[in-house]
Each structure stands twice: as C-alpha cells, then as structure tokens.
C-alpha cells in the first residue's frame, strides 16, 4: 500500500474519478485526516481502491470522543471505493483486508455509508460503535444567495453587513491575499477561541496546503474590513461540487460570515451544483451551525467492530 501525502494525492484523485466521480470524499479530504491522528494508505485493485488507516491515539478525534470504546491496536479498514452499487466487489475488497489483519485483535471498519453498512452486515456480524455526520451538502445557488424563507435570518445578517460594513470592506482572492497577514489573523482567531488547542491540527493542515493555495489548486477568499483581514475561506472545486476545507470569520462583525460565504461561492463555485461543508468534527455547536443553513442532505457514516 502507498501512504497518502501531497505527492500522490492527484494520482489517487484521478483513480477515484475513474471509478466513481460522485464519491463524496476527495483525495485531499483523505489526506487532511493525517492532521487529526489518522494516516491513510491506499491500494489500487481491478475492483476498486482499498484503504487502511493507522491511528494515532494521542491525536485521533474519534478516540477522543469514544475513549475506551475505540482503541485500535492494528490498522483500521476504511470503506473501499468501487463502481456504484457493486456490493460483491465491495465485500471482496473488505474480505481481502480482513485477511491481512490479526483476528485475535479488534478489527474495525470505518466510514461505511448506510448502504455499505447493510452490505457488510449481510456477510459479517458487526457491532456499530459510532455514527457520524460526515458531509453536510447544500445547493450552491441557495446558500450563495441565502434565498428562501428558511434562510431569512441568514439573509438578514448578510443585509446588515452590506448596510453597515460593505463600503469599507473588500474581497481578495488567491494570490491577491498576503498569506503572512492571513496567518496572523488565523492565529489571533484561534487564540481568541475558548479552546485554542482544538484548532492546532487545522492550523497544521493550513500550513501544509499553502502550496496548493499558491498554485491555484485550492481557492482562497479573504474578507477585509478597513484593510484588515476579518475572515477567510479555503475551498476546492471537484466534479461539479465545492468542498470547503477551512472557513473562519470574526463574527463580531455581524453578517461577516454570510458575506464571505456568499462571495466565495459566487466567485469560485457558481457552476458547482453542490457545496460540501464536510463534517461536524463531533461538535454539537458545529453541527448546529451547519444544520442552520438547511442542507439538502447529510451523509451519515458508521464505524463498526467485526465480531469474529
């Protein structure tokens, strides 16, 4: 297997596109997990792509949430990617991975969608350890304009920013943004949080993907007020879908986040049908915030333990 990093992420993405272009994780999303205590390795097969994860218990978010319920002592199987609706291929890849593991130690399979969970249950006895919301997906045009009755409160915030601040505000994108100035804002934003340690992994990810921002692979949008950065968004366009990796604002400026989000989507992603704001990091407050924007649908995924 090859360990995933920035040198081979494009190779993995190309293969994902060939197998299932509607797959809701990009190679960069898989790579981002390495900053949260989960190093992903992958292998190409005729039937698809298999994944193993090596868990760092000191940094892994899921272990932090589940504690003793999730303490893997060997590699964890992550849901393979196959052609859509191919349960036999999916289960064959799972079988091959289980055979590589020690059945005297706990065997976990993570990241199963509801359909994939049923496939696995048809062949194996499993215990569901955890359910998570991994993808909050929105109609791009809807959250770009904040249209409709359900988003009236968000639109009110946007209109407030436009009325109170827009004349002294500015949007800059990509290379127009001074990354050193941006990082200073980011560090200040983190240090002002209730728990700055919760964002150290995300900060490390931001620093690692700077080259992708600089070469235009990732899209950067920064919001300035009186020439000072008060918010930014890092996003990615793939297969008619926008993925938002990082998004933060100084929300003491009412409506700043709505203004940033609207402009980021309008500038970079107006042709992407869906916007994926990714997972809720196991945080009730993040989940509440993402739900308040009325997603079109949410993808639930499951971690299971195989009963040998």
Swiss-Prot record:
Gene3D superfamilies for the chain: 3.40.630.30
Q: Which domain of life is it from?
A: Bacteria
Listed as disulfide-bonded, the cysteine pairs are: none
State one Pfam family annotation. Answer: LPG_synthase_C
Q: Which InterPro entries match?
A: Acyl_CoA_acyltransferase, LPG_synthase_C, UCP018688
Q: List the PANTHER family.
A: DUF2156 DOMAIN-CONTAINING PROTEIN, PHOSPHATIDYLGLYCEROL LYSYLTRANSFERASE C-TERMINAL DOMAIN-CONTAINING PROTEIN
Protein name, entry field: Uncharacterized protein MYCGA3080
Q: Give the organism the record lists.
A: Mycoplasmoides gallisepticum (strain R(low / passage 15 / clone 2))
